[in-house]
Structure formats: structure tokens, C-alpha cells
């Protein structure tokens, strides 16, 4: 009896295929401020720069003057002990958090909120940033790292600067063990085995005395879906002789 292939098992979403988010220190997001706090400048200090399992960029642990704590994606140029400002009147410096409507046009920002108060959704991966393009009445046009333009509420918060850890993908893994540990933090399955290298019960392309290329079209597909040789007993010049012999045999039997 056959088995479900790996892709089908992953599609079900069992525990083996879920990203182990419980290993992370905390979610990287802005804390919720009251309406009064949003109008003033709140200061905080970076206590430490930490690595969060499963994330591409380092994180900074920020403690506010009112005692609240949060973890945010670290930006280039910050350091332990740096004072971080939150508010519309904050200085335009790396690490400070401001409403995107108060940030000058052309400024590079990261951890941009999609909706006001959601904690940050855009430009959070290592080395990424968005660019403030145009301010309008109540919205701001932002260019994302992909080049796509989006319009967000001018009250949405963003961090000044570029997310730290740029150039991460330029460093080679070198060893398969490094790639294994990388995949384990994301619940990826590594190494990835080819279907035709498996046994027949494990994959439709598996089995046989030697590896053969599979086909994406099943044998019982309708005629319009099959083009070329699908399920043919033989092909080539030898097949012509074989069919001629079969035709002669049928004629003798009919005679």
C-alpha cells in the first residue's frame, strides 16, 4: 500500500511541519501606546542585542522609561546603551520610531505598520528597508524592498534605518550540517530527496531497477491532456516491427 507523499503531509500542517515559534524569545513588535502617549516623545534604552531563533535579523531589547519592554528588529548603527525615541517629535536617527507621516520624504525606514497599531509588518528581514516617497492628506506612499508601492495610514509607525544583518545570503553554508540546522529552525525538511530516488510506495515517480524521469500526467488522464507517448508499450523502430508482427498474428487468427 502506498503512502502520502511529503508534500501532502506538509499540506495537512501537522506538528512536524509547523515552524517552532515557541523557541523564540518574544514577538518583534511595537507595544501599544495610549492616545496621550502617541502625542508625546517617549524614550527608551537598548539593553542588549540578541539573536532570535528562526529569524534572519538580530533583535534589540528596548526598555522604556515607563518600565515597558519590547523586542524590535535591530537596525544598522545601533548599540547597547543607545537612547531610542518614540513619538512624532523624535529625531530622524537610526533606531528611532515615528509616525510615518512625520518622517521626511526619501528616508529609509523598516518595520512599517500595515495598519495602525499592528506592531509592524513590512521590511523586517535582514538588510531590507522601505523608502518614504510621498505624503498625502492622511496617507503616505511607501516603496517596499520589492519595489512595489503601497499606501499606509500616516499614523502608522516605522523605524528609521535599515534592518541589520545585510549580506547574510552572500555567506555560503559550506557544510551540509549548517544547512540542516538552518532548516531545523524553520521546520523545513532537509535534505530534500528526489521523488524518483524513492521506493515505489513512497512516491509516484519511485521504484524500478534504475532511476527514470517521471511524468506530470497520469496514465488514466483524458485524451486531451496526454500528448506524445503516455503509457505506450514500446516506442522506436523496434515497436514498428512488433506492431507489424501483431497485425500478422491477428490476420492469421481471423483467417
Curated annotation (Swiss-Prot):
List every stretch annotated Disordered.
201-229
- GO CC term, one of those recorded: cytosolic large ribosomal subunit
**What InterPro entries does its record include?**
NA-bd_OB-fold, Rib_uL2_dom2, Ribosomal_uL2, Ribosomal_uL2_arc_euk, Ribosomal_uL2_C, Ribosomal_uL2_dom3, Ribosomal_uL2_RNA-bd_dom, Translation_prot_SH3-like_sf
Listed A to Z, the keywords are: Ribonucleoprotein, Ribosomal protein, RNA-binding, rRNA-binding
Keyword set includes RNA-binding: yes
Q: Which Pfam families match?
A: Ribosomal_L2 (PF00181), Ribosomal_L2_C (PF03947)
> Tell me, which GO biological process terms does this entry list?
cytoplasmic translation
Q: List the disulfide bonds.
A: none
The UniProt similarity line reads: Belongs to the universal ribosomal protein uL2 family.
Quaternary structure and partners? Part of the 50S ribosomal subunit. Forms a bridge to the 30S subunit in the 70S ribosome.
Q: What is this protein called?
A: Large ribosomal subunit protein uL2
Q: Which organism is it from?
A: Caldivirga maquilingensis (strain ATCC 700844 / DSM 13496 / JCM 10307 / IC-167)
Q: Name the encoding gene, please.
A: rpl2
Amino acid at each position: 500500500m502506498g503512502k502520502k507523499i511529503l508534500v501532502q503531509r506538509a499540506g495537512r500542517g501537522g506538528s512536524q511541519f509547523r515552524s517552532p515559534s515557541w523557541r523564540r524569545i518574544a514577538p518583534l513588535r511595537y507595544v501599544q501606546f495610549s492616545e496621550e502617549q502617541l502625542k508625546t516623545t517617549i524614550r527608551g534604552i537598548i539593553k542588549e542585542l540578541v539573536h532570535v531563533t528562526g529569524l534572519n535579523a538580530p533583535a534589540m531589547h528596548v526598555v522604556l522609561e515607563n518600565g515597558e519592554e519590547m523586542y524590535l528588529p535591530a537596525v544598522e548603527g545601533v548599540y547597547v546603551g543607545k537612547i531610542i525615541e518614540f513619538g512624532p517629535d523624535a529625531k530622524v536617527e537610526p533606531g528611532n520610531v515615528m509616525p510615518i507621516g512625520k518622517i521626511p520624504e526619501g528616508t529609509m525606514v523598516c518595520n512599517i505598520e500595515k495598519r495602525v497599531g499592528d506592531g509592524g509588518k513590512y521590511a523586517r528581514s535582514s538588510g531590507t528597508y522601505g523608502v518614504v516617497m510621498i505624503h498625502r492628506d492622511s496617507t503616505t506612499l511607501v516603496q517596499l524592498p520589492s519595489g512595489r508601492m503601497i499606501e499606509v495610514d500616516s499614523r502608522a509607525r516605522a523605524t528609521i534605518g535599515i534592518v541589520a544583518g545585510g549580506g547574510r545570503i552572500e555567506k555560503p553554508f559550506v557544510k551540509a550540517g549548517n544547512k540542516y540546522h538552518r532548516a531545523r529552525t524553520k521546520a523545513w525538511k532537509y535534505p530534500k530527496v528526489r521523488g524518483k530516488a524513492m521506493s515505489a510506495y513512497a512516491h509516484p515517480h519511485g521504484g524500478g531497477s534504475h532511476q527514470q524521469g517521471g511524468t506530470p500526467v497520469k496514465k488514466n488522464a483524458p485524451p486531451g491532456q496526454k500528448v506524445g507517448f503516455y503509457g505506450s508499450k514500446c516506442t522506436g523502430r523496434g515497436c514498428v516491427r512488433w506492431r507489424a508482427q501483431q497485425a500478422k498474428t491477428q490476420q492469421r487468427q481471423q483467417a
